[in-house]
Amino acid sequence: MQEKSSRDQGSRATAFRERVESPDNQAEGIVVERWGNPEVLSLVRDDPAIVLEGGQVLFKEGDATDGMYIVKSGTLRIRSGSVVYEDAVAGGIVGEMAIVEDELPRSAMVYALGRSEVVKIGEQRFFDMVAENPAFARTVMRVLSRRLRRMDRLYQPERRTEHIPGLAP
């Protein structure tokens, strides 16, 4: 297991990020990242939580949008089919794409790896949090960017520019 902690310059909080080998993805040689941000967690510290038991599904790919979630405790796994994208731990966010994309269906399944607690954030509260807390907005943008880059690496390695014939290195 390799651990990496990075300083989130925009929010002045330390975001937790860890890379771990996933038994689910060993055949593909994929490394799963676990991610959480203490500053995001602080935004919902006093909010009531939804409790999930290990293996319980929060939402499935294709489900209608009903908000996004911030992980208060435990670990949620994000996957589509047989591919595990990421594990979200305390301070991590899941389901944000559905709000940002104007309520399109869920693009992945999310489930608890063990007992976990999440806080549901509806669309209006999400946009209020973005407007009132620029650091939260930057965090959401970074999460979206990181997940997009990961998807590019997983599904489109042949589209990388170093593989285009005729281009100089």
Regions found by a protein language model. Give the residues of each.
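Cytosolic regulatory regions built on CNB/CRP/Popeye-like sensor folds
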Residues: 1-169
